[in-house]
Amino acid sequence: AATQKVLTDNGVAPYDSKEMNEALGLIKGLVDDGSIHPDTINISAPEARELFAQGQAAFLCQGMWCVSQWDANYPDLNYGVMAVPVPDGVTNTYVQAGELSPWMGIYKQSKHPKEAAEYLMALYDEQYGYQQSNVESGSFVSCIPEINEKYMTNEHMKQYYTIAEETSRVVPTLVKRDEKANDFYAEVKDVQPSLGAIVQGIISQSITDYDSALKTLANDTTTEWKRASEAVGMDYSSLEFPNWDATKDYTDADYETLK
C-alpha cells in the first residue's frame, strides 16, 4: 500500500509477497556488504542531498526535487539520473504513478469555493507563469503535459522525465472507485511496525527476521482494513482490482469493467 493507495491481493494486504521479501532481502544484502551509508537512518532528506553533493555517497534514492536544489547550491556538480535498478535478467518492472492531476483541491465545505476555484485556475494557467517557472528551474514536473513539453529545458529534469515516462505505470486508486474511500482513509489506523519501520530495522540491524515481520504486518493490516471498511460502510472487496495488469496503465475503461 502506498500513501492513499490501499490495495489487496486475493483479499489480503500484500506485504508478505514474494516480491516484497526479495526487495527487503536486497536491502539486507546492501547493509551486510557495507553499501548503505552508515548515517542513513539518522539524517533528513536535505542532509542526504548534501552528503551526495559532497561526494560522500555515490547513489541517492530521491526524486526530481533534488535537481533545482543542486543547481542552486552546487552548480558544478557532475551527476546523472537513472532508472530504479533491478536484478539481472528481470524485465517488465515499473514504478507506480498516480493519475496526472493537481496536488490541490477545494474543500467541500469551503466558505469561498468560487474564489478558491479562480485561484487554482490562475495557478495552473500558463499565463500566470508559476507552472512555467517551476518546470524551467527543475523544481517539479507540471500536471499539464503541454507545459512540460514547452518549458522543460533543464537537462537533468529532461532525463528524469524521460525515464519516468518509460518506467512508470498508472495504478488503480480506491478513491476513484468508491465514494467512501476518503472516509475509509480517515478511519484506518496505522499498523506497527509499519513497512517503513521494518526497512529501518533492517538498515539499523535491529530486525533480522524480516520475513516474520512482513507476515505479521500483512495479517494485522488485513484485519485493520477490514475493520475500517466495516466502520464506514464500505465494501471491503473494493480494495481488490482483479483486472489490473501492472505492466499497463490502469484506465477509465478498466474501472468501468468493475461496475
Residue ranges and their predicted role:
Residues 9-41, 84:
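Glycine-centered hinge/linker elements that transmit conformational signals in sensory
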Residues 40-53:
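Short helix-initiation/N-cap motifs at beta->coil->alpha
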Residues 1-13, 28, 57, 233-236:
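Extracytoplasmic/periplasmic solute-binding protein
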Residues 66-76, 88-98, 105-197, 236-238, ...:
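C-terminal lobe and pocket-closing loops
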